[in-house]
């Protein structure tokens, strides 16, 4: 009897040695959460893959949800066969039916992977045998090409036998939560949502912190950033969205510090506030969308001065990326169109005409002596808002 399943192949999880079981268990949990709205008849693991049985009519939607789970290399609709040559022959005929395009000659190659080495005949004998079965029935539409075929027909012989042809690419990476927690400084721009996506791909559970300067920034600008957080949560899962009004800090800097120091000093305040929130919520690291040289504060000297105010690691996944590369990812994950909506954020509203690009820590600290740092940080945190974004 032939049954349709979805097979899920894990990526780096297979390299995790003794921790592999823990990583796979976490990934499977995320997959089942992602497809919980669908009727799943059964699921099980077999030698490095997860197999899911569901209604074939739901396959496209189920696969679309599974693709968004990090830790997966590819997904394949497959036919489960009995471990006999006859059943495999039926399996390859069933799987190729959907690949044949009438009136267009296509080429294929059979690729047998015999995990169970006790099974006979061996792969070099099975490949032409199964290929011959296909040619006998569909020789008018397909032919064999072992060097450059239009598609492969894969046959995995394990405890059971599975036949498939499509390998639908997943995002790879590691399952969410397997690499700790991070607090993303989320602006309204293109970069920070991409940074969130990339860190989530590495297994980091991401929460978001947004700084605004209402009423100098608009409510519509805030709603834009909240929408970005919701779009990011499609990949990261549930997000705690912290909103902080940084206006008291900007006013104090404007009154007491040199204008050209505005950007670097305000960034240091952002890191101080972010560190407080992270420590109070057991978050392991801070995340930014900074890219080296992209704006005035994103120089090596600027990054060094910003780092000085926190003992937490600051993860910068975009630090060596070109803007075109960042935009490409933003388009792919669906955040680009929201990011380019024309609303200003606090960084653009209070940008000095000639910001310092190579700040020295001594000069910055001397300017900060004119500020009551702890009082300003506390004032911002006291007025913080928290929005829980849930999938």
Curated annotation (Swiss-Prot):
Disulfide cross-links: none
Gene3D superfamilies according to UniProt: 3.30.2130.30, HUPs
Catalytic activity: [ThiI sulfur-carrier protein]-S-sulfanyl-L-cysteine + a uridine in tRNA + 2 reduced [2Fe-2S]-[ferredoxin] + ATP + H(+) = [ThiI sulfur-carrier protein]-L-cysteine + a 4-thiouridine in tRNA + 2 oxidized [2Fe-2S]-[ferredoxin] + AMP + diphosphate; [ThiS sulfur-carrier protein]-C-terminal Gly-Gly-AMP + S-sulfanyl-L-cysteinyl-[cysteine desulfurase] + AH2 = [ThiS sulfur-carrier protein]-C-terminal-Gly-aminoethanethioate + L-cysteinyl-[cysteine desulfurase] + A + AMP + 2 H(+)
Signal peptide (UniProt feature, chain positions): none
Subcellular compartments: Cytoplasm
Stored Pfam families: ThiI (PF02568), ThiI_fer (PF22025), THUMP (PF02926)
EC number: 2.8.1.4
Main localization, broad class: cytoplasm
S-adenosyl-L-methionine keyword on record: no
GO cellular component: cytosol
GO molecular function: ATP binding; CCA tRNA nucleotidyltransferase activity; tRNA binding; tRNA-uracil-4 sulfurtransferase activity
Keywords noted in UniProt: ATP-binding, Cytoplasm, Nucleotide-binding, RNA-binding, Thiamine biosynthesis, Transferase, tRNA-binding
Keyword DNA-binding: no
Protein's pathway: Cofactor biosynthesis; thiamine diphosphate biosynthesis
Ranges for domain THUMP: 60-167
Superkingdom of the organism of origin: Bacteria
Chain's role: Catalyzes the ATP-dependent transfer of a sulfur to tRNA to produce 4-thiouridine in position 8 of tRNAs, which functions as a near-UV photosensor. Also catalyzes the transfer of sulfur to the sulfur carrier protein ThiS, forming ThiS-thiocarboxylate. This is a step in the synthesis of thiazole, in the thiamine biosynthesis pathway. The sulfur is donated as persulfide by IscS.
Protein family (similarity comment): Belongs to the ThiI family.
Protein name in UniProt: Probable tRNA sulfurtransferase
Gene source species: Finegoldia magna (strain ATCC 29328 / DSM 20472 / WAL 2508)
